[in-house]
């Protein structure tokens, strides 16, 4: 009986290691070199009947305006941090504890880890896995690859994923031809692309678009996007 229990525990530990350590490492290394074909969210939305328009484009086929705009809108310290912006997390925690509208403090790296490898949700298990995958992609991918995958996996509306699909659907151009103004309109609907609209935006999105445009000027001036240039 003792031998059986020890063997069972050993097998369970091995399985746990494979699931939590080896499996994620292998997946991250694999996606360092090949485009992620689909994400869990894409599958979920497709099952919901929203369709799936996703066209991968390498970094050099996407307008340099888009990463600058996304850094301005989502993560001004993207080139500085190692996956986590602890100051932003603290501000988000204080904001949420005060009873105001829930605010996230996720970096682009964290969002990429969530988008590519995990399911939507706010459970502690998912957040823990998100942190683990964030460490892995920061270690094995580097900033350019993280941004490349991020731009290709963002949800931009019902069934619309990535820069190319969004550029074609909303503006009738390729991702390589996106202007800063168009990129700002895309960024303005994040993180609620099913709620807010790129075309005929409401007051909130219009105001946010202008704010992002101004912030992008600072990103360019201060070299905050140099790591993906």
From Swiss-Prot:
Its main location: membrane. InterPro entries: Glyco_trans_51, Lysozyme-like_dom_sf, PBP_transglycosylase, Pep_trsgly. GO terms for cellular component: peptidoglycan-based cell wall; plasma membrane. It is found in: Cell inner membrane. One of its GO terms (molecular function) is peptidoglycan glycosyltransferase activity. Keywords: Cell inner membrane, Cell membrane, Cell shape, Cell wall biogenesis/degradation, Glycosyltransferase, Membrane, Peptidoglycan synthesis, Transferase, Transmembrane, Transmembrane helix. It is a single-pass membrane protein. The chain crosses the membrane at residues 11-31. GO terms for biological process: cell wall organization; peptidoglycan biosynthetic process; regulation of cell shape. It is an enzyme of class 2 (transferase). It catalyses: [GlcNAc-(1->4)-Mur2Ac(oyl-L-Ala-gamma-D-Glu-L-Lys-D-Ala-D-Ala)](n)-di-trans,octa-cis-undecaprenyl diphosphate + beta-D-GlcNAc-(1->4)-Mur2Ac(oyl-L-Ala-gamma-D-Glu-L-Lys-D-Ala-D-Ala)-di-trans,octa-cis-undecaprenyl diphosphate = [GlcNAc-(1->4)-Mur2Ac(oyl-L-Ala-gamma-D-Glu-L-Lys-D-Ala-D-Ala)](n+1)-di-trans,octa-cis-undecaprenyl diphosphate + di-trans,octa-cis-undecaprenyl diphosphate + H(+). Pathway: Cell wall biogenesis; peptidoglycan biosynthesis. Its EC number is 2.4.99.28. The keyword Repeat does not apply. Peptidoglycan polymerase that catalyzes glycan chain elongation from lipid-linked precursors. HAMAP family: PGT_MtgA (MF_00766). Belongs to the glycosyltransferase 51 family. This is Biosynthetic peptidoglycan transglycosylase. It comes from Caulobacter vibrioides (strain NA1000 / CB15N) (Caulobacter crescentus).
């Amino acid at each position: 009986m003792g031998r059986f229990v020890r063997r069972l525990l050993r097998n369970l530990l091995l399985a746990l290691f494979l699931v939590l350590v080896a499996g994620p490492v292998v997946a991250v290394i694999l996606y360092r070199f090949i485009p992620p074909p689909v994400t869990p969210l894409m599958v979920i939305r497709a099952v919901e009947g929203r369709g799936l328009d996703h066209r991968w484009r390498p970094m050099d086929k996407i307008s340099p305006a888009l990463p600058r705009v996304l850094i301005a809108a989502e993560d001004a310290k993207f080139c500085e941090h190692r996956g986590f912006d602890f100051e932003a997390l603290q501000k988000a925690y204080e904001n949420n504890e005060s009873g105001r509208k829930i605010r996230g403090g996720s970096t682009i790296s964290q969002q990429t880890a969530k988008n590519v490898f995990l399911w939507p949700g706010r459970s502690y298990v998912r957040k823990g896995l998100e942190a683990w995958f964030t460490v892995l992609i920061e270690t094995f991918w580097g900033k350019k690859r993280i941004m490349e995958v991020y731009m290709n996996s963002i949800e931009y509306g019902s069934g619309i994923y990535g820069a190319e699909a969004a550029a074609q659907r909303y503006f009738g151009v390729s991702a390589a031809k996106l202007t800063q103004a168009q990129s700002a309109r895309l960024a303005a609907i994040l993180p609620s692309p099913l709620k807010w609209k790129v075309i005929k935006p409401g007051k909130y999105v219009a105001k946010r678009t202008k704010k992002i445009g101004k912030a992008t000027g600072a990103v360019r001036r201060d070299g905050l996007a140099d790591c993906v240039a």
